[in-house]
Amino acid sequence: MRTARMLWMLALAVAMPATYAQTAKWPDKPVRIIVAAPPGGGDDFVTRLMAPKLAELLGQQFITENRPGAGGSIGQTLVLKSPPDGYSFLLAGGSMAGARYVNAHVTYDVLRDFTPVSHLEISPFYMLVHPSVPAKNLKEYISLARSQPGKMTYATLGAGQIPFWAALLFNSMARIQAVDVAYKSIAEATVDVLSGRVDYFFAPSATYAANQARVRAIAVTSAERSTMFPQVPTIAESGLPGYDMPAWRSIMGPAGIRRDVVTSLNAAIARTLAMPDIREKMLLAGSQPVPSTPEELTKKYAEWIQRFGKIAKEAGLKPQ
């Protein structure tokens, strides 16, 4: 009896550290959010805006750490290889759902290798054309492009980015043939749109805001009009019903993060995105706050993986 009791106590003592670790308070040190893009962009804006509020709610610093490069894979890999302790998260974009269709070196599975936390926001892209393009609206542009198959050009930021997918979907639904001109940065693409060297570019809100006098916005890629420029119609209402290809962002961590950590961070994100000052700043920047449950985020990624797969198949894309 004594031997059995001693063995039970020994087992309990061994198990206690693990049990304690599973229920330990979180966070008890700063939390980092990896942004797989350079400072100063839309990704950076969202995390830096939210960080002070998350710190107030959860009692620890939330630090934005920019890790750009290799189309986002440097930052993504860093998070994948981080311990699932709740102190490293990724600002994940919707484009991750389509990465495997264009990049043969992508080894991760979004649904298997990441822990979903919360959806954050939706940001439309604006279809910008040079004023010399003789099309005042989307229907006129489609008619123009159909009359010149293979001659119209459009700027993208390389295979796999949302403007790339937005253009492929647009060309397919509009039944037009156009030439993709890839650029390394938004700035370079914008210069060529402003000069008329390319015909159109799906650009973020900030690009249109800074160049309204020099370009024409004929449509936005989201299902609803932007709060920033509500006068610009959606592609869907301009003749291509069902079109919807905005940028969207979420927070994810490496696979295996404790459920209570996910629940705490998810609740803090929802509260932050509901704060009037946060909502106002995001809306003014053309970003629509849209929190979610982890389950809703998983469902959205699954749906977009299928969407990108269909677009890739129709376009004949092969991973490079």
Per-region residue spans from a language model:
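Structural signal for conserved beta-strand scaffold positions within catalytic alpha/beta enzyme cores
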Residues: N66, L91, P116-H119, T156, ...
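Hinge/capping helix and adjacent helix->loop/strand transition within the periplasmic-binding protein
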Residues: K81-Y87, Y101-E188, I235, W248-K281
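C-terminal lobe and pocket-closing loops
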Residues: I122, A206-A274, E303-Q306
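Short, low-complexity disordered leader/linker segments with a strong preference
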Residues: M1-D28, Q320
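N-terminal (or domain-start) structured segment
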Residues: A21-R112, K151, A159-I162, M173-F202, ...
